[in-house]
């Protein structure tokens, strides 16, 4: 890449890593009607994506609960692709605040609420104890929280504490690029113990009256 300005030329040489596999999530039976639960189908695509591969989600509205990324993979949301959060909180897994070790001394932080390691629902997109993950494209993560009960009495714990839109914990080399994240259940992007996190050219859209969606 070369840039010329004020008589000077600046040059940057770089090499992008090769994409090993292109995984079309539509082949896993996605139903783009905005109503059918696609959680298992989408997770199957993410979980079976080989190292260095990209999971491609075409345009459409895909209802889903929590999804979990794996290391060395990319999630590409095509323009017009919307991952639409499930409105039923009982469809979301609950993550323990901490996991104790066998020696009963060490603990592993998994999630929390307002600074405390408390059991919470898993987010719409979870990046947990992984590395080299990219989420990119012009698509949207829409938690659709306004159409559930997530914003009703938000300080009251119901089953577990509210999830995040994107929850990243104990991970490294994470990039969110180009996407839109909106209508979050609570905090929108929540990184904890994350090294080398890039947030590039992406949008956050939450209504002014949405509680704690900063």
Residue map of PLM features:
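Extracellular/periplasmic carbohydrate-active domains that bind, remodel
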Residues: 1-214
């Amino acid at each position: 890449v070369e840039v010329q300005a004020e008589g000077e030329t600046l040059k940057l040489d770089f090499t992008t890593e090769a994409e090993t596999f292109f995984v079309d999530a539509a082949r896993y039976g996605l139903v783009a009607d905005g109503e059918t639960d696609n959680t298992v189908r989408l997770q199957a695509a993410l979980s079976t994506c080989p190292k260095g591969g990209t999971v491609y989600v075409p345009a459409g509205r895909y209802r889903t609960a929590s999804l979990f990324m794996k290391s060395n993979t990319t999630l590409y949301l095509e323009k017009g692709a919307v991952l639409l959060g499930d409105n039923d909180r009982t469809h979301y897994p609950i993550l323990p605040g901490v996991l104790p070790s066998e020696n009963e001394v060490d603990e592993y932080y998994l999630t929390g609420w307002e600074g405390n390691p408390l059991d919470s629902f898993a987010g719409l997109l979870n990046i947990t104890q992984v590395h080299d993950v990219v989420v990119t494209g012009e698509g949207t993560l829409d938690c659709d929280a306004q159409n559930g009960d997530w914003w009703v009495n938000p300080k009251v714990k119901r089953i577990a504490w509210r999830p995040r839109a994107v929850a990243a914990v104990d991970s490294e080399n994470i990039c969110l690029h180009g996407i839109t994240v909106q209508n979050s259940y609570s905090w929108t992007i929540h990184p904890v113990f994350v090294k080398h996190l890039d947030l590039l050219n992406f949008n956050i859209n939450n209504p002014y009256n949405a509680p704690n969606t900063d």
